[in-house]
Amino acid sequence: MQKYIGVKRIEARPMTRGDYNTYRGWQIPADENPADEGYLVKYRDGYESWSPKEVFEEAYVVEDDFPLLATVFNMKSPDYKRRFEAEYCQLKIRYEGLKRMCEKWDAGELDFTPTCPRATYDKQMAAMVDYLSVLEVRVHYEDIDLQE
C-alpha cells in the first residue's frame, strides 16, 4: 500500500464523549463511556465530529506551537508565490531557532552540549542570512507578498 501523510487545518476543543452526544442531541449508547476524554473537531466545510483524546493528540498539534508545520499549506500550493513564501518562512524559522540556540550557548544556558564547533554554527548562520537576503531580493522583483 502507498503511504500518506494527512495535512488539514481544523478547529477543536476538549470535550468528553458524553458532552459530545449531548451537544449533538443524541442518546449515549450503552456500550460507550460518557467520561471518555476527546475533542470536538470542526473541519473547514463546517462538518463536526468527535475524536478520542489519544487519536486526536497523535494526529494534531496546536498551530501556534509549530510554525514550521503551518508552512506546509503553502508548500503544496499550485501558486509559486505561495510555495516561495513557504520556503522563505521555513528558512527564517530555522535561522531564528539556530540564532536563539547560539545566544543561549553564549550565555551558558544551553541544556545540551553541541557536537560541532561554534564556528560551524556561525558559518551555517551566515549562509542562512545570505540565502534569506537573496529571497528578499526576489520578493521585491517578483512582487511577492510575504504573509508572515
Residue ranges and their predicted role:
Residues 94-117:
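Short E/K-rich amphipathic alpha-helical oligomerization segments
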Residues 1-86, 99-102, 126-129, 133-136:
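Motif-centric detector for short Cys/His coordination patterns
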Residues 40, 50, 110-111, 120-121:
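Alpha-helical interaction segments
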Residues 61-62, 107, 144:
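Sparse recognition of residues in long alpha-helices and their boundaries
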Residues 112-138:
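Short, charge-rich amphipathic interface segments used for partner binding and complex assembly
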Residues 65-66, 95, 143:
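Generic N-terminal initiation segments characterized by hydrophobic and/or small/turn-forming residues
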Residues 110, 137-148:
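Long amphipathic alpha-helical coiled-coil segments
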Residues 90-97, 138:
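Polytopic transmembrane helical bundles with strong interfacial aromatic enrichment
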